[in-house]
Amino acid sequence: GKNWEKYSISADYEQITLQPGIIGQRVNELLAPYGRKFAPDPASVKSAMVGGIVMNNASGMNCGTHANSDKVLISARIILMDGTLLDTGNPVSRASFEVSHRDFIRRICELRDEIRTNEKLAERIRYKYSIKNVTGLNLLPFVRFDDPFEIIAHLMVGSEGTLAFLSEVTMKTEYDYPYKASAMLYFKTIKEASRAVVAMKKLVDETGEWTVKGAEMLDYKSLSSVNDPVFLKYKGEVASSALPGVEPGDETGLTAVLTETKARTPEELQQNISAIEACLQAFTTYIPVRFTDRPEEYSKYWAIRSGIFPSVGGTRQPGTTCLIEDIAFHIEDLPEATAELQQLIARHGYNDACIYGHALEGNYHFIINQSFSTQAEVKRYEDLMNDIKTLVVDKYDGSLKAEHGTGRNMAPFVCHEWGDDAYKAMKAVKELFDPQGLLNPGVIFNDDPQCHIKNFKPLPLLVMSDKRQATSLVADKCIECGFCEVNCLSCGFTLSSRQRIVLQREISRLKQSGEDPTRLALLEKQYRYPGNQTCAGDGLCSMSCPMGINTGDLTHIIRQEALPKGSLGYKAGDFVANHFAGVKSALRPVLSLANFGHSLLGTKAMSGITKGLHNALGIPLWTPAMPKSYQLQATELQATSTMQHNSAALVA
């Protein structure tokens, strides 16, 4: 994302132009002073960048289908496969494109008319996009817009880089309600929780706006992964047979719905809360309904929700892979479909799996921790995905991918979900934008019906010495979510903390397998500068890691193993540390000599000569920024001492 973080806000604050590398949370920080916010709100908003949010149509907990990237996008600046730069919001760029790409525009218009003429297809598109759906390419623009440039811009949403490079977007901002309240509602069954969500979805105020702005479902496994205190209480009561109607020892029914309402005034907020509480009287909750409008309280609820994926992933067995999928059902099907989904996952033996997500939109994520080490495990996963396809598509006509891009895992099922006519239209769009099929191949469109059960990425355990094993076990919990990268000082310069773990896993895999010693040696050599030497080692990465993994600790281990006690490098460093004054005095003439050489030879010649010596002998590389030698005078030392004394006096 570095160097792609420019932005501009319109004079009325209702539009913002963004480059793709800026993080979603940063956009919210920029808009907050004006009472506005970035409409898409995925749980990963503190780490996800605008480009990824748009190209995956990652929506989130509140924006639903009414304020996702597709609905708030105004224009896009893209670079096509042939190198053409098109800014759909710039009249000059549009006019130029109409001349240079006449056939391209004509084909977009033909596809638009073909889809609209096929009334059955057009109606299916409207129906499919009435809920969250990112399976395949985005066909909705063909029925929403007449202007071919509007269609082109909106085709980018959810396209996962398969059509063009997105270099800039202009989007509508959203009003940020100043008054908010949330409640964590607990139900004894997932079906009862779903019925309550369906009822709350129907609540609207006098202006026609939804009273409930968000309803996030968390099943029992989600609650267990974060040690939710209410879940622990429920578990204890169930274990002691203290709950009538609940099978002793069966805590799998407890389901939470994190509910949020927002308003323009305190009075309006209270009206909303009263309306929701009245609605919920028709349902039995495990504990009484209690809303809070205190940010310090409800922010904890939402922090729990945002951390579910990495927290559940962190409980996986070492060596297994944490997989997440997101599906969507129509709201009227929610109670039955949700219960069947839970039963289906359990039937396949995924006892540590969890279901959670945006219940108000009928959109759920489910997480499984999967081993691919045996053919039996691969077959189990294949059977699960086939049954998911049958449940979601064949029975409920829902979405196999709701908000995070199709990906390779769902690519084999795109045609099955959409049907031949829609799939043919998607293929025509792909062929128009990328006739050679070079952009992100195999994603969205894949001719291999088994591509989702091939080429699995291994997650080998890190190999460390016995004394360092505790730290490596912590790092083994990494699910490579990337939440750490926002705090990593070297991210964008060399490697991020996540990438360091990824590379160390590959190094460990090669060590364990012994399959390619040459590649192992090359990786270890190439890792030294970007992986080891440029890591700050300060542990800031752990502050945004849900598992608290400190990649700096891993770097310290690598450094210690590279320079063990008794080695020449360790002895040299130890000597310098204990004789710094003498070493400093000895190095002063070296700096003077380097400065003399620079003044005599000039920058160009000095750089060339020292670079040659560096390559031949390994001496430190000279740069024009290298300082001259300097020795503090007695008066300067006295002044420094006086300043330190005064500072100490002020502190006292």
Locate each region found by the language model.
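N-terminal glycine-rich flavin-associated loop
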Residues: G1-P42, A58-E110, Y177-K188, L323-E332, ...
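Iron-sulfur-associated redox domains of electron-transfer enzymes in respiratory
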Residues: N28-P33, F38, I327, D333-G349, ...
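A glycine-rich phosphate-binding loop feature that marks nucleotide/adenosyl-phosphate handling sites
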Residues: S44-G51, T135-N138, F142, E216-K233, ...
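Conserved phosphate/anionic-ligand binding catalytic regions in large, soluble enzymes, centered on
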Residues: I53-N62, F149-E174, G357-N363, L400-K401, ...
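Flexible inter-domain linker/hinge segments
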Residues: E98-V143, F433-V486, G492-R509, K604-T642
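C-terminal substrate-recognition/cap domain of FAD-linked oxidoreductases
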Residues: V143-F149, A153-D383, L391, Y396-S399, ...
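Iron-sulfur-cluster electron-transfer modules
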Residues: G314-P318, G514-A652
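Ferredoxin-type iron-sulfur electron-transfer modules and their immediate structural context
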Residues: V393-L400, G405-C535, S544-L568, D574-H579, ...
